[in-house]
Amino acid sequence: MTYTVYEAMPLSQMLARVQKYYPGDGYKLVEKAYLFAQEAHKDQYRKSGEPYFTHPCFVASILVELSLDPPTIAAGLLHDTVEDCEGITLDTIRQEFGEEVAMLVDGVTKLNKLDFADKEEAQAESLRKMILAMGKDIRVILIKLADRLHNMRTLKFQKEERRVAIARETLDIYAPIAHRLGVYAIKQELEDLSLRYIDPVGYENLVQKVGQKRSEREENIRMVIDELSAKLDEQHIHHTIDGRPKHFYSIYRKMVLQNKPFDQIYDLIAIRVLVDSVPDCYAVLGIVHTLWNQMPGRFKDYISVPKANMYQSLHTTVVGGRKMPFPFEVQIRTWEMHRIAEYGIAAHWRYKEGGGAANDLDSKLYWVRQILDWQSDTRDSREFLDTLKTDLFSEEVFLFTPKGDVISMPKGATPLDFAYRIHSAVGNKCVGSKINGRIMPLDTPLETGDRVEIITSASSKGPSADWVRICKTPQAQAKIRAFLKKEYREENIETGRAMVERECRRRGLNPPDVIKPEYYDSILKKYGFTALNDIYSAVGYGGMASVYVVSRMVDEQRTQIGTLKALGYSDGAIA
């Protein structure tokens, strides 16, 4: 990002930037929203002591940096007016700025209104709301990401406990979503800012260690760039090269995951080469490998097989000899790929506005639609949170169908996950799998490059409850549970009843004393159930844990007994 916490765009510069990438009179909408928000927030101040309007102004500046359309920028300027400004309603926004801007403001406002006593449940519902918002209009999430980025930049003005909570939520929810949308410019800053508050000592130590050898490292980078640039000039390849240190959180995460001290983390820098065409990318790759020794297993071709978030680039890690006597990464991509690498889905939005690439944009967001498909079947908030975090954070593997189509899936996915990824009917009728021509168990972890063939049978009775355990992706698990829920309701009820009663007895409780309407009514209301059998069915098909059900009933029992005692009833009367 060009603009820091100390510098937001003045109105004249904001309008000039918008006119440059969005010709026409759209800038007038931005100007009107700017002046409206400035007036609406005129007597309000942030905890930093700054006028409140600095916040929506920064949010809009970030959205302009992403080259987003005028309605999105206007909504960024107005996003807090309905919630925080007396006399301004959604109808006011609709009348002044139109339905599109009002819809975006409403979407952001709804994301701000989540309030749960249970922090984990609140986090799960935050994620659920954000995914639903993505399905309706991805721009709502882009505004929310810009909003969170500026709030993180000014987080030091909050109390310490709140700083840590906000930073953790940012790292768990906002940064992964920015990653999935390919908006690395926001994702990396969110991660570094979060680390500063979650582990301040570790962060400061890391900053200090990275800074200690900065001058030496910068000199090494300069020599490597000069050497590579000279070779590219000889081949008449138009290029731009820059060197940059890896961002702090990526270094920190590598130290934690690999359990290595800072001194044993070598690839701390990346050289980025930007060229005009795809053939030039591969030509540069060849030159890099002639200049320096390639490290085995460290080459990735994201041009021929792009990531799900549209990222394309060639990555290779090499050792630079005397001039750079440690490994460093070289990333090679075109200018267009670089624009998408920095701004992700935001880079595509203006093309959709023109109508030229709407279908392509929609296809890039297939994972959002998948999550929307299965989230409604996931009753338990904690399960939803855990599975979605896995889906957002996980690395990808790239697999081939028998016809040669490429399918990306989370690392650790099995042939059964692959089957359900193709279609629910394929998964439900799956009886076996072949990996690279060999029959393999359905729980085999798949690796990049595997050719996967699913064997089906029309006579298959469908999935069993064990398949939920075999599958690693929440999408496949949700489809299996949906099948079990529909096809085996009576069996699920009996299984669930037995599991709940067994859990009661395990705790030394008499089931009839605990399984009472007044104790399970809160579960019915929370999940939209109508009868106890719905709870049993959910437990039976794996959609809800018996431990959770019994815990909720016991908690409710204790609460009600405590209330009666407070009112003066004796134990005998309560019993």
Identify the residue ranges that each predicted region occupies:
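Short, contiguous pre-domain boundary segments
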Residues: 1-23
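Divalent-cation-assisted or electrostatically stabilized phosphate/pyrophosphate-binding catalytic cores
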Residues: 47-58, 94, 103, 162-172
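Interfacial "coupling" helices/loops that link adjacent transmembrane helices in transporter permeases
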Residues: 546-575
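Alpha-helical phosphate/pyrophosphate-handling elements in metalloenzyme active cores
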Residues: 32, 36, 42-76, 81, ...
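Internal insertion modules embedded within essential enzymes
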Residues: 5-11, 98-101, 107-269, 281-286, ...
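Hydrophobic packing positions in regular secondary-structure scaffolds
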Residues: 71-72, 76, 80-83, 94, ...
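Catalytic palm subdomain of template-directed nucleic-acid polymerases
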Residues: 81-89, 216-217, 272-286
